[in-house]
């Protein structure tokens, strides 16, 4: 693993601007499958990765009281799963000959996975005055999943793509000299999935989804915090939350996790209520407490 970073601070055009690059290489012997009783002896997963990232921060961007934070990360990941031995192994290292390979239980395979990933994060906050501010947040996560096999000529190469856009808008209030704070927020979760793989559709669910589809899901909520005095403060919140599946859950990891392409986002209704404060026991001794309840 190696990493290099360079940048500048306190410039007229940027409070902070950094560029970094890193490379890594991992050679991993696989010990078990999805269950501990499924023992591997010669299966391997080798990975080479490279990353370039940029981050930028600027207060009073273009206009006064507009703060901007942005970052970009691009990763190139190439993994190779080696499954070329017709053996069945046991925990003591012994084995017997088998009619199929260790991982897939089929013919010999030297499967390649190229998974480029792009992550963009940006945040802009504008303060109207000491009591009101508006915040806009955007996150892009794009993961590719190109697969091909050097040895299994029956395998059809595929190129899947998962793209997630999350756009959030929040309005913040502060009253009573900062003792009462409210936040109202709205989020749009956009999920785009393009799938070419059809192997093991009875496991992956690839036959149950369209080859290319885009879905949008809304989240929203409100939160408030009231400080009565330093020892006594109360906070409460409600959120209709959404969790989009990550790339590993949808597309698998190429060895121990099968793809689950038909997996849908999770949603929940969350209520939180809490009591917290800071009690001064002596001039140099303070006790902070917090009690929370949620459903």
Question: What residue spans do the PLM features occupy?
Answer:
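Membrane-embedded beta-barrel scaffold of Gram-negative outer-membrane proteins
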Residues: 235-239, 266-295
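Predominantly the C-terminal beta-signal and adjacent terminal strand-loop region
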Residues: 40-47, 251
């Amino acid at each position: 693993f190696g990493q290099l970073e360079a940048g500048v601070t306190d410039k007229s055009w940027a409070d902070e601007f950094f560029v970094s690059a890193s490379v890594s290489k991992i050679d991993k012997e696989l010990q078990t499958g999805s269950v501990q009783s499924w023992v591997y002896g010669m299966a391997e997963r080798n990975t080479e990765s490279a990353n370039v990232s940029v981050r930028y921060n600027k207060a009073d961007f273009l206009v006064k009281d507009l703060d901007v934070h942005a970052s970009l990360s691009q990763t190139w990941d190439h993994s190779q799963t080696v499954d070329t031995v017709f053996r069945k192994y046991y925990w003591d290292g012994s084995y017997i000959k088998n009619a199929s390979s260790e991982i897939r239980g089929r013919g010999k395979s030297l499967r390649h996975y190229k998974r480029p990933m792009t992550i963009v994060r940006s945040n802009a906050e504008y303060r109207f005055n000491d009591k009101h501010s508006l915040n806009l947040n955007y996150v892009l996560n794009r993961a590719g999943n190109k697969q091909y096999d050097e040895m299994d000529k029956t395998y059809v190469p595929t190129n899947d793509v998962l793209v997630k856009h999350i756009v959030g808008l929040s309005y913040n209030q502060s009253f009573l000299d900062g003792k009462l704070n409210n936040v109202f927020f709205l989020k749009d979760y956009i999920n785009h999935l393009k799938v070419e793989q059809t192997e093991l559709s009875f496991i992956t669910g690839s036959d149950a989804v369209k080859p290319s589809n885009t879905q949008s899901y809304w989240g929203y909520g409100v939160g408030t915090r009231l400080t009565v005095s330093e020892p006594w403060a109360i906070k409460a919140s409600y959120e209709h939350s959404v969790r989009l599946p990550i790339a590993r859950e949808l597309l698998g990891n190429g060895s121990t996790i099968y793809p689950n392409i038909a997996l849908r986002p999770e949603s929940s209704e969350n209520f939180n209520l809490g009591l917290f404060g800071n009690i001064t026991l002596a001039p140099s001794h303070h006790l902070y407490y917090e009690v929370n309840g949620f459903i």
